Amino acid sequence: MSKKFTMTLLSSSLAGLLVMSGGVSAQNGTYSVLQDDSQKSGPVKYGSTYEVVKTVDNGNFRYEVKEKKNDKRTLFKFDSEGNVTVKGKGITHTLHDPALKDFARTAEGKKNEQNGNTPPHKLTDSAVRGVYNKVYGLEKTEITGFSVEDGENGKVSLGSDAKASGEFSVAVGNGARATEKASTAVGSWAAADGKQSTALGVGTYAYANASTALGSVAFVDNTATYGTAAGNRAKVDKDATEGTALGAKATVTNKNSVALGANSVTTRDNEVYIGYKTGTESDKTYGTRVLGGLSDGTRNSDAATVGQLNRKVGGVYDDVKARITVESEKQKKYTDQKTSEVNEKVEARTTVGVDSDGKLTRAEGATKTIAVNDGLVALSGRTDRIDYAVGAIDGRVTRNTQSIEKNSKAIAANTRTLQQHSARLDSQQRQINENHKEMKRAAAQSAALTGLFQPYSVGKFNATAAVGGYSDQQALAVGVGYRFNEQTAAKAGVAFSDGDASWNVGVNFEF
């Protein structure tokens, strides 16, 4: 050790004295502190204001800084790592100073020998005054609104009137409360009153067990177990167990249902509803959204796209058109055939002529001549048969025409149905695009939260901010933390992106 690092024994009778008492050994020595100008040039100078007393307790070194005057008043104590433990009002702080650590390493022989005019350590009068001023300030600092309960079921509360009464509960914010086991409330007047419940945001309420409320004034009813409400004034209402409300003023009133999007309201159990409420409580009118970006459905439970329906209906239309064409050709051929047969029969008729007295004057195409009246009767009968045949043909043509009209109406109805499906699919496409943006915002928020720092120094609060991004979305995260001692620290963070928010709260235990 350097000769410049002098050690002055209080008296020769104390040199090498070893005192044994109750199994604890102690060895005392007094060390000098450097003057402020000793590190500039010239011989090393030692001050007359402060001294350091070294003790050894079961192999652990402790150093006590005292004034040389004023009855050797103790200013502070530090360990071999340069840490000063300060007991303030309501909390214990740990202060670290590099000059103290350098002094301890020199006193314990852990530094290389110093030669010439180089000071053996960095502890000067001004360094002692600086540390003492910090110690004095911390001793006089009173922290209110902060509480940590020691033990296996520790509870943490931070903020005016904050209350954490459940096991492993955390309450952060003015008037925040966490009353059940493993509950967490972060934000002014946030309330987590269910077991394993989480409330994050100003005025959020997570009343049910295993419920989560995120966003200003988000609410989960105490009967809606496993409910999740995320968004400004989002709500999971009475008996809506396992309900999820995502979006500003989204409301779930049914079991195992999801209200997706701002102002969306569920209408039945086991439903995902993306429509939004547009009217008052009395008229209960709803708007629609487009769910976009869908692939063609392949299973019976999958949604079909407009393109998929168009292709299917196009095939049906082509098939119907082909069948109508074939049937029309058949009917035309049949009509032509029957008309030809009638024409042949008409051409084979018997032509007769009569005079003014009604007597037969000629008979063409007949093997026998008959009376005019008989001939007219026979001709009338043949004409009736011709009329009957033509009437039958007209009936068939009429039926074909009716069938064609019926098919045309069916095709028109199918076209209207396709147009309705197209409108619904357009709404679904728009909603999927919004969901895609929401997922990218969530990823950006997660990246920002990852960038928040944990407090490292004991007794120190830290406020930290970070930014994160994913694809074309960015997020800002802010957080606070506090290290209670070398083994325990806690932090909380909130990330914001385009009106959405996510959060985390963590407690760290080191062994």
UniProtKB/Swiss-Prot annotation:
InterPro entries: Adhesin_Head_dom, Pilin-like, Serralysin-like_metalloprot_C, YadA_C. Residues 27-460 are extracellular. Residues 304-349 are annotated as: Right-handed coiled-coil (RHcc). Residues 288-303 are annotated as: Neck. GO terms for biological process: protein secretion by the type V secretion system. Pfam families: YadA_anchor, YadA_head. It comes from the Bacteria. Residues 384-418 are annotated as: Required to bind IgG. Binds (in a non-immune fashion) to the Fc portion of human IgA and IgG; binding occurs on the cell surface. Confers the ability to survive exposure to human serum exposure. Binds to the Fc portion of human IgG, IgA and to whole mouse antibodies also via Fc. Upon overexpression cells acquire an extra cell surface layer that forms a zipper-like contact between cells; cells autoagglutinate and form biofilm more readily, suggesting it may play a role in defense against a host. Homotrimer; can probably form mixed heterotrimers in vivo. Will form mixed heterotrimers with EibA or EibC; these are correctly located in the outer membrane and bind IgG Fc, although less well than homotrimers. In denaturing gels runs as a band of about 210 kDa. Binds the Fc portion of immunoglobulins; binds more than 1 Fc per subunit, can be modeled to bind 3 Fc per trimer. This is Immunoglobulin-binding protein EibD. It comes from Escherichia coli. The gene is eibD.
